[in-house]
């Protein structure tokens, strides 16, 4: 088996995904005791892992540094990359939502101002609804934007809704459901077809058996 390099995102999604790899027989002991390391070798397979920021996973896969990547669908929707999306892993499930303070009127004909970390997704969503909105990109916590009057509402990923609730915001619209996806480099799918499909097929069977 030729070496397969897999890019994972650090943090919450990583914790959801590692058990899936372990369940298909890939040793992840180094990943679970990583310290400050960012590159790891599976002890029982020719598979190595790299840990990068979520927004960079698809970039590493697109450019062939990684053969396979696991990343949230939000990243793929916001940043169009020339890769194959192979599998919905069914973990890290969240929703894109429009949220604001209780006095927000989503049916108002007045041009709205929306704060978000995801301007591309937000623009497409409102365009498809036939609404012209002003979009302000914010890198940090967007919840404060409608509270301070910077924006009428926000578009953000909601998992439990606790953060919104703690800041006095409510969900007005549920836009899209998202989850972790397995992506593959296009060239690698030709040169390492058997190895990649072996991982994808085993992962798919594991997901189906767990439903």
UniProtKB/Swiss-Prot annotation:
The pathway where this protein functions is: Amino-acid biosynthesis; L-histidine biosynthesis; L-histidine from 5-phospho-alpha-D-ribose 1-diphosphate: step 1/9
Assigned EC number: 2.4.2.17
Gene3D superfamilies per the record? Periplasmic binding protein-like II
Q: Which UniProt keywords apply?
A: Amino-acid biosynthesis, ATP-binding, Cytoplasm, Glycosyltransferase, Histidine biosynthesis, Nucleotide-binding, Transferase
UniProt xrefs under SUPFAM superfamilies: Periplasmic binding protein-like II
Q: Enumerate the GO terms in the molecular function aspect.
A: ATP binding; ATP phosphoribosyltransferase activity
Reaction catalysis annotation: 1-(5-phospho-beta-D-ribosyl)-ATP + diphosphate = 5-phospho-alpha-D-ribose 1-diphosphate + ATP
Any one Pfam family match given in the protein's UniProt record, by short name: HisG
**Record-level GO cellular component terms:** cytoplasm
Where is this gene product found? Cytoplasm
Family note: Belongs to the ATP phosphoribosyltransferase family. Short subfamily.
Q: How does it assemble?
A: Heteromultimer composed of HisG and HisZ subunits.
Provide the protein name.
ATP phosphoribosyltransferase
Q: Which organism is it from?
A: Bacillus cereus (strain AH820)
